[in-house]
Every structure is written in structure tokens, then in C-alpha cells.
Amino acid sequence: MSELCYIISGTGYTRCHSSFYQDNAVEKEKLNDIFKKVNQLTNHKFGALYNACTESNFGKRLMEFDAFSTIHADSGGLQIVTQGAEITEKLKNDVYHNQAKYSNLGMCFDEIPVTVADGRSSRNDTSGRIFDKDNFHVYAENTGKNLLDQINVFDK
């Protein structure tokens, strides 16, 4: 029989990162017990996802709950791009180090071969996005470089 792993996103809504749980061992254990109970209900594991860029303090706090089978860390690239901000080498490096330290699985900064008409786009709005087929290979090579950089940080 297959074993599934359910990864919760939006971990901020669990409030497990809040001072209420971080400063109160009894309440923290109660929350951990709730997470453990979920693991016992069906044939699946229970993991968590956080954004290593915008929620950089979540990974450390999620690791304190032993009920999570795995912790996944998103790069935050889409959120950065949709806000019209720039993804710098320093930002990527900071994210990679956070992922390596606090997660079991880190998602990379993938270069998406899309240009945005006005330089900014909401996450779900695709009306102003244009596929950049002429530079597809450049985006692919940049993604490969990002993966190599991430792997090198994880291997340290």
C-alpha cells in the first residue's frame, strides 16, 4: 500500500510560530499532539511548507514540532517577482542557507520564460504575461545554475 505525505501550506495559520506556543511548553506540546493525531488517522504522513524568503523564521520553529515528517521550504521567487522586486544573488544565497538548515526539501529559484508587460503581475493574473520562446534556453541555463548553487549550499 502506498504511503502519502500531506504537506500543509499556509503554516502561519497554525500559529505554531507565535510567541504563544514558542514561550509556552505546555501549549506547544498540545499543538504538537494535534499534529501527531493527524498522523495516526490514516495511512499518511504529515509535513509542513514554509516560504524561506518571506517566512525565514518559520523553519527553525517548525523543526521544534516532531510530528512533522518533513519540512519543505519554498524559495519565495514567485512572491518576489509578483511584487516587482528583484531576486539578487544575496537573496538567493540567504534562502538556500535557510533551506539547508531548516528543511528536508528546498525548492529552487526557477527562471520562468515569461515577460510581464508592465514589470509587475499578481500571482494569479496571467493577462499581462508573455511566453519568451526566443530566450527559453537562457532561462533554462539560469535555472540550472540556480540548482547547482543551491546544491552546493546544501552539500556544505
Enumerate the predicted regions with their spans.
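Non-catalytic, usually N-terminal nucleic-acid engagement modules in DNA/RNA processing proteins
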Residues: 1-155
